[in-house]
Structure formats: C-alpha cells, structure tokens
C-alpha cells in the first residue's frame, strides 16, 4: 500500500516571518490527518525555522533544489548534506522552473538525485512535458527521456528514497489542470516504465505525484485514480486553509 504524499512548494514566496506564520497556521489544521505524508518546501533561508516550528508534528520539510557536491569551492550552492543538517527530510529536484530558467538537464538532475540519496534525503523527482511537446504528441517520449535520465545508474535498493512528481508544464500556474484521465494515463506510463527498468515490485512500490494547478476542488478526482499517489502543490500551498483542504482529500 503506497502512503499518499502531499507536498507544498512555496517557491520564491514568504519571508521568514511569513513562513513561520504559515507553518504555525497549517499545523493545527492537519495535525489529526493520518496516513498522509505532509511536506512543505520553503525558501532556503526559512528551512531551519520552518523545520523547528514543524517539530514533531509530522509535517516534514523539503528544499526546492540542491547541488551535487557535499562541500567545496562552489559559491552560492547548497549541498544535500547541509539541507539535512538544517532540518530537511526531502528535496525537490528537476522542477520544470529549474529546467526552464536555470539550465537544469537530465544529467544534473541525476547528479543531484544521487547526492541527495547519499545524504539520506527523499527526492521528489520532477518530470513533465511542455504544451508544444504535448500538442506534437511527444509527451511519452519526453517523460521517458526524463525518467530514464533522472534514474540513470541508481540501484533498485535506493528507489525507496525517490518519489516521482509528474508536472505537465502547461498546467503549472496557468489554472489549467490535466484531466483526471490525462494525469492517470501519464502516471500509468511512468509506473510501466519503472517496471521495465527495475521490475514490477519496485514500480508498484513507487509513489507518483501529480503537480499542476492542484486545488482543494480537484484533488479528490485526481486521488481517485489508481496510479496517482499524491500531489506537488504550488499556489494553493501558500495559504494554510487551501493546502489543508488538499491534505484532507479523504474528507
């Protein structure tokens, strides 16, 4: 049985004071939720503060990116080892905004994923196609390239530290959402692909999240699909009430 995971990506929003207020407001709204893993991803500067505020409440903290070296002369970078030290249990790697604006490639995603696993973090490995790619019927080709690239040379034993997040780029921040059936089709493809690479039991155990304009209004339909195991939430995670509404998808 795969435990659902709901992750909130706060992106480049929330000062230290705002982040503290948000986690303080969120915790009481979700503290009684059982059998759902809850993760929030604040900006780097708020990670330690949010981790301390979350404490033993069950809400976990992720970073939005990391570097692939543990330490060294890499000005401006943050290693998975330091993220773990700051209170992170998870890290988002390969988000479409990193790929689009910062030159992230499948190769760097793979290096970062290996480094994060080495540090003991759980990776939220993001994949997804653009609108142009979907319209030219390249969705599955793009997804396969990204999944194979991200998982290259990662042994099956380490898959327990990887969660795949499918985020159709055309649905991020646009208000457009893939239909439940569209999302399920890609999730099923990803699971089949993981089965081809590693085997059916590994594929069956892997959690695959959907990301792309997830809201309290559409989470129930998405979560009713057999291969959708949770959500990577953007805008709706910036308000405690809406994020809690997503976390509480079971009612």
UniProtKB/Swiss-Prot annotation:
Cystine pairs: none
HAMAP family named among the record's database cross-references: TIM_B
Subunit structure: Homodimer.
Pfam families reported in the protein's UniProt record: TIM
Associated pathway: Carbohydrate biosynthesis; gluconeogenesis; Carbohydrate degradation; glycolysis; D-glyceraldehyde 3-phosphate from glycerone phosphate: step 1/1
Family: Belongs to the triosephosphate isomerase family.
Keyword terms of this UniProt record: Cytoplasm, Gluconeogenesis, Glycolysis, Isomerase
A GO CC annotation given for this chain: cytosol
Gene Ontology biological process: gluconeogenesis; glyceraldehyde-3-phosphate biosynthetic process; glycerol catabolic process; glycolytic process
Catalytically driven reaction(s): D-glyceraldehyde 3-phosphate = dihydroxyacetone phosphate
NCBIfam families with a match to the protein in the record: tim
Keyword Plastid: no
Binding site for substrate: 9-11, 173, 213, 234-235
Gene Ontology MF term list: triose-phosphate isomerase activity
Chief place of localization: cytoplasm
Record's function text: Involved in the gluconeogenesis. Catalyzes stereospecifically the conversion of dihydroxyacetone phosphate (DHAP) to D-glyceraldehyde-3-phosphate (G3P).
Subcellular location: Cytoplasm
PROSITE patterns hit by this protein: TIM_1, TIM_2
Active site: 95, 167
Protein name (record): Triosephosphate isomerase
EC number(s) reported in the record: 5.3.1.1
Top class in the EC scheme: isomerase
